[in-house]
Amino acid sequence: MSPEMGELTQTRLQKIWIPHSSGSSRLQRRRGSSIPQFTNSPTMVIMVGLPARGKTYISTKLTRYLNWIGTPTKVFNLGQYRREAVSYKNYEFFLPDNMEALQIRKQCALAALKDVHNYLSHEEGHVAVFDATNTTRERRSLILQFAKEHGYKVFFIESICNDPGIIAENIRQVKLGSPDYIDCDREKVLEDFLKRIECYEVNYQPLDEELDSHLSYIKIFDVGTRYMVNRVQDHIQSRTVYYLMNIHVTPRSIYLCRHGESELNIRGRIGGDSGLSVRGKQYAYALANFIQSQGISSLKVWTSHMKRTIQTAEALGVPYEQWKALNEIDAGVCEEMTYEEIQEHYPEEFALRDQDKYRYRYPKGESYEDLVQRLEPVIMELERQENVLVICHQAVMRCLLAYFLDKSSDELPYLKCPLHTVLKLTPVAYGCKVESIYLNVEAVNTHREKPENVDITREPEEALDTVPAHY
């Protein structure tokens, strides 16, 4: 066998074949060389911008979104590394001539980059969000060199804001509660933080259209009033841009609820397209009274194409919009069956679903993973809107709730979304405030916990142990 046809080694994460390392590749490994960058290489998303420009807000939301669509993503917040290294006293730590502090900050950046490498190359991560100011060309060059050496793609997100009102609101909402300012006087916090911003302004070098024309980036001006996008390289970067151009910070609430109890719910049958039960109709009117009591301005109402959500919305007496994407998960051959019937006719399928409920796909039907992909346009539109009431179904509501509450794929299929209960979601600084409102109309329980025994050879009694009661 010729040297050129030597052993091939598959890289576990990139799923591609590269020549096995040998003595002849010494030149390729010399200092300053880089790993080849492939189409599906891991990506580093690098935040850029002065303090109080919403970088951590963007990092958190983007990470939540990418994880939800199935792209393993993690935030590396440099402020946390700095707080672990040294306790914060005041803005003087960030003075450009504080050489001791500069060295500490650089060491923190290197420690964070080491963790980024471990995550992307050894923990099966695909996107690392490097959340820091990264305001100098020197710091960005350090990151670019690091990415080149490890074969990572780089995408910059720069948040630029010159509106004093927006900056002040960001400081009020986020920085006053920062670990740097625990138990500090409000006015002193504001004064110190504004001086910290001034320290960064001295050496701030924004991404430049000419000098950085070879880089991939998006510049966001004044919380989304204007955008500049340059050299988007791949699918992940294009989805990132699309997502960032849809989010906003306008105060609003999203109301999630299921349809009223249906005739098939009462009988313990999944799926189907039945109408509301007597109690389901009572709930529809209770929902109308609740929504009216909230005094919500410009409320939009969305339903699926299914009879039970439409009947629930009709009681509101307001215009509503039907989304096919909001239809319940397709149970395929198991549509309109009870869990007992599924266990009787398809015991192996029933066990396989219990083993991996998120990825299991019903024969001729869908999985929760499929449902998440179907619901992505709904999430995008929810991010664009202000006040919305979504009347949907159990599996659909679980997927939407998992997005807003940052739940993993293992947790998602078991989130509790009871009938006749409204969840009010109000976005806050780095997450979502949840209020659960039960509207005092009884309904059957449709929630089935994961049974202890998920083996295919289990007894029927073990398989049906967590099935809720029904008529």
Swiss-Prot record:
Enzyme Commission no: 2.7.1.105, 3.1.3.46
Active-site residues, as the UniProt record annotates them: D131, C161, H259, E328
Region (6-phosphofructo-2-kinase): 2-250
Protein residues bound to beta-D-fructose 2,6-bisphosphate: R258, N265, G271, R308, Y339, R353, K357, Y368, Q394, R398
Protein's UniProt keywords contain Transferase: yes
Keyword terms of this UniProt record: Acetylation, ATP-binding, Hydrolase, Kinase, Multifunctional enzyme, Nucleotide-binding, Phosphoprotein, Transferase
Coiled coil spans: none
Tissue expression as described in the entry: Liver.
Binding annotation for ATP: 49-57, 170-175, 350-353, 394-398, 430
GO molecular function: 6-phosphofructo-2-kinase activity; ATP binding; fructose-2,6-bisphosphate 2-phosphatase activity; identical protein binding
Annotated spans, Fructose-2,6-bisphosphatase: 251-471
Regulation: Phosphorylation at Ser-33 inhibits the kinase and activates the bisphosphatase.
Enzymatic reactions: beta-D-fructose 2,6-bisphosphate + H2O = beta-D-fructose 6-phosphate + phosphate; beta-D-fructose 6-phosphate + ATP = beta-D-fructose 2,6-bisphosphate + ADP + H(+)
CDD domains to which the protein is assigned, alphabetical: HP_PGM_like
Residue intervals passing through the bilayer: none
GO terms for biological process, alphabetical: fructose 2,6-bisphosphate metabolic process; fructose metabolic process; gluconeogenesis; glycolytic process; negative regulation of glycolytic process through fructose-6-phosphate
Modified residues (N-acetylserine): S2
Residues the record lists as Phosphoserine modifications: S33, S141
Subunit structure: Homodimer.
Family to which this protein belongs: In the C-terminal section; belongs to the phosphoglycerate mutase family.
PANTHER family in UniProt: 6-PHOSPHOFRUCTO-2-KINASE/FRUCTOSE-2,6-BISPHOSPHATASE (PTHR10606), 6-PHOSPHOFRUCTO-2-KINASE_FRUCTOSE-2,6-BISPHOSPHATASE 1 (PTHR10606:SF15)
Protein name, as recorded: 6-phosphofructo-2-kinase/fructose-2,6-bisphosphatase 1
Organism from which the protein derives: Homo sapiens (Human)
Upper classification of the organism: Eukaryota, Metazoa, Chordata, Craniata, Vertebrata
